[in-house]
Structure formats: C-alpha cells, structure tokens
C-alpha cells in the first residue's frame, strides 16, 4: 500500500493509515448536488455477519468497491435488519457527523449524530424495520452523511445552524432471502 505513514486516497475520500481492514465504500451513484462540498471522511459498510461488502484490488494497491449501497437482506420473518457502518476521520481536526435517511418510518440510525476525533473511527448501526410496506421499499431510499468542523458545542447545538463541510449519499437496496 505504499508508505504506511500516509493515507491512501481512493476516489474522493481518504483511507486511514495503518488500518488494513478498513475498506472505504468508494464512490457512489448518488453524486453531490451542485455546490455541495466533497466528503472528507471514510465510510466502511459491513453486513450483519460483519463481512465487508467491498473488495481489495491488490494489483493496483487500492481498494475498489464491489457494492456501492447499503444492502438490507430481508427475511420472511419480518424481523428488523441492521447494517454496521464505520466512519473514519483521516483529517487533523475533530469533526461532527450527522446521518439522515429518506424515511424515519422504516429506518433508524444509531447514533444519528456525534463526533469523530482525528484519525479515529466510530461505529454506526442503520436499522431497516422490515415490515410489510411494499410501497416504501419500492421508492429510491438513501442515507446522507454530513460532516462539519467541531467548535466545542454539543452535536445538537452544532447542527442547529452549522455549515456542512462534506456530503455523501449512499442508496439503500433491499434483497430477498427467498
């Protein structure tokens, strides 16, 4: 991977140094809107069994994404499904993050906002309620990840009127286990 002391750039994000198992989710089909700032943090998605949904391309010494979305494997028993996510801050400053979803009726994000210190990683769980709402899953759902610089206020106070420093959207996908 080159020099272990320097971060490795992948797409428009930066991967953390010395974390071989951290594979960034890569670019997404949902591009930023005009004027939105580039996302500077790294996101890693794992399914319920903690297996990464990204693969490493050893020939090019970089990570490439196999799946560029949050996938929920829906079961017949209609139990809620979770996806574990890790958010890494490769910058030199503490940042606050916020995760939004397209429907609070069918998704939950725990925690929806918080802080990530420089060179640290936080865990986030996204839940899909998995109820019989066929019209809900037929829509194009996505999760929006935002970050801004921290200034000492609480996360709620900070997000009440802060300027977004980076944006990234990942689409949701629903897979049947039939």
Swiss-Prot record:
InterPro entries: Ig-like_fold, MSP_dom, PapD-like_sf. Residues 52-177 form the MSP domain. It holds the Pfam family Motile_Sperm. This is Uncharacterized protein R05D3.5. It comes from Caenorhabditis elegans.
């Amino acid at each position: 991977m080159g020099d272990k002391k320097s971060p490795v750039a992948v797409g428009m994000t930066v991967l953390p140094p010395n974390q071989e198992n951290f594979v960034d989710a890569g670019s997404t089909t949902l591009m930023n809107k005009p004027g939105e700032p580039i996302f500077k943090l790294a996101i890693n998605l794992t399914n319920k069994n903690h297996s990464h949904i990204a693969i490493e391309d050893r020939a090019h010494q970089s990570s490439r994404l196999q799946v560029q979305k949050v996938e929920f494997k829906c079961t017949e028993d209609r139990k809620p499904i979770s996806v574990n996510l890790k958010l890494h801050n490769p910058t030199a400053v503490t940042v606050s993050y916020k995760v939004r979803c397209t429907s609070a009726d069918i998704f939950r994000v725990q925690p929806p906002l918080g802080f990530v210190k420089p060179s640290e990683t936080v865990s986030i769980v996204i839940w899909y309620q998995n109820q019989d709402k066929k019209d809900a899953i037929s829509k194009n759902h996505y999760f929006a990840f935002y970050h801004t610089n921290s200034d000492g206020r609480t996360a709620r106070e900070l997000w009440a009127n802060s300027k977004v420093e980076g944006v990234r959207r990942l689409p949701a996908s629903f897979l049947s286990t039939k």
